[in-house]
């Protein structure tokens, strides 16, 4: 069996409205759904064993269909710094065109810039920013690789799986 396309990634936020505003005002991604999880669901499904804990869940949609699912729990827990070498999610990535314009735009919006635009050995450009909660966001301009990955990616995956990357499937 094979999966379909990538659907979504979930992040916990400290302020639901601020997260919605951030993703809309900075990236033009609208909130497309909201639900509230009652305490019994928060305890049973999320494993948060705090009396009366609740969770507001929202879905923020990117052009192309991928979604960021945001979770806002009450009561809040303090944020914890997570090192990159810890197993688990490290960042999300947003594809853009014209990396230098995006860098200047994000600076003008007051977004925390972590690194300056740099060119990767494969030719695409990238830099990192953080949202208001410190979640790491990679901004990348794949340039011509966007089309290569989008249209030739499935063929490349098929070829690489049987060739140079076969050892990773063992």
Segments and roles (model prediction):
Residues 14-17, 31-33, 62-66, 72-136, ...:
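Vicinal oxygen chelate
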Residues 9:
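Acceptor-substrate binding/catalytic loop of class I
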Residues 39, 75, 121, 143-146:
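A short acidic/small-residue loop/turn micro-motif
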Residues 12-64:
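Core segments of cupin and vicinal oxygen chelate
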Residues 5, 53-54, 88, 123:
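Exposed loop/turn and edge beta-strand positions of beta-sandwich/beta-sheet ligand-binding modules
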Residues 144-159:
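A short, polar/charged loop-to-alpha-helix boundary motif
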């Amino acid at each position: 069996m094979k999966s379909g396309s990538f659907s979504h990634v979930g992040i916990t936020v400290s302020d639901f409205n601020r997260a919605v505003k951030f993703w809309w005002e900075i990236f033009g991604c609208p909130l497309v759904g909201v639900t509230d999880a009652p305490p019994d669901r928060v305890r049973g499904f999320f494993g948060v064993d705090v009396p009366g804990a609740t969770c507001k869940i929202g879905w923020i949609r990117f052009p192309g269909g991928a979604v960021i699912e945001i979770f806002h729990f009450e009561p809040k827990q303090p944020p914890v710094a997570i090192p990159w070498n810890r197993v688990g999610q490290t960042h999300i990535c947003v594809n853009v065109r014209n990396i230098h314009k995006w860098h200047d735009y994000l600076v003008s919006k007051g977004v925390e810039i972590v690194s300056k635009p740099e060119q990767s050995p494969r030719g695409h450009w990238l830099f990192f920013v953080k949202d208001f909660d410190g979640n790491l966001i990679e901004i990348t301009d794949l340039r011509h690789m966007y089309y290569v990955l989008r249209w030739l990616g499935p063929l490349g995956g098929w070829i690489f799986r049987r060739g140079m990357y076969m050892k990773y499937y063992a």
